[in-house]
Regions:
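Short loop/turn motifs enriched for small/polar and acidic residues
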Residues: 12, 78, 113-115
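Acidic-residue sensor for enzyme active/binding pockets
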Residues: 30-31, 79, 111, 156
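Catalytic strand-loop segment that frames the active site of acyl-thioester-processing enzymes
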Residues: 1-43
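Residues that recognize and position ribonucleotide moieties
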Residues: 7, 18, 73-75, 122, ...
Length: 164
């Protein structure tokens, strides 16, 4: 994992058995993705498509609510998976890691891990998220901008060649 983000386990995160509810893990992964993207200068790079994309202008879809002055491009989560290794409880001190492991033509695959903040061998969960770079007005996938691909390559320390 490249970017680590500390998580504060809250009382509201717990189920009746005082474990972190299984659905909360996805929220922890989401917070880690946000922390990861905060390391990218000028995120979300929304203006790049004006010169890079050949997509034609399509009608706005009511499924995605944006304002006229809002961002037109960004990620939508297509898939999230989580494997639970150990239960999390209120007193655990943990951090969530994120790494980009694949960049496709329109998709970005990230892996996540929740671990003990001091004992890094104590892994609570591992997960994966598939995000799609979309035009928010149309709800349709568009190519990942080259500047975003380059930012991922810089953070991760290796290339993500454009698939042909």
């Amino acid at each position: 994992m490249k970017i680590w983000f500390p998580i504060q386990i809250r009382f509201r995160d717990l189920d009746p058995l005082s474990h972190v509810n299984n659905t909360v893990y996805a929220t922890y992964y989401e917070e880690a993705r946000s922390a990861y993207f905060a390391h990218i200068p000028h995120w979300p790079l929304a203006g790049e498509h004006a010169t890079e994309s050949s997509e034609k202008e399509e009608e706005h879809t009511a499924r995605i609510q944006t304002t006229v002055v809002g961002r037109h491009y960004g990620i939508l989560i297509k898939e999230i998976t989580c494997t639970y290794h150990l239960p999390l409880i209120r007193t655990d001190r943990v951090e969530v890691g994120s790494a980009v492991v694949h960049v496709g033509r329109t998709s970005i695959v990230m892996e996540h891990q929740i671990r003990d903040i001091q004992n890094h061998e104590r892994i609570f969960s591992t997960g994966r998220a598939v995000a799609v770079w979309c035009n928010y007005r149309t709800g349709r996938p568009v190519p990942v901008p080259s500047a975003l691909r380059a930012a991922f390559e810089e953070i991760e320390g290796h290339a993500f060649p454009l698939e042909t």
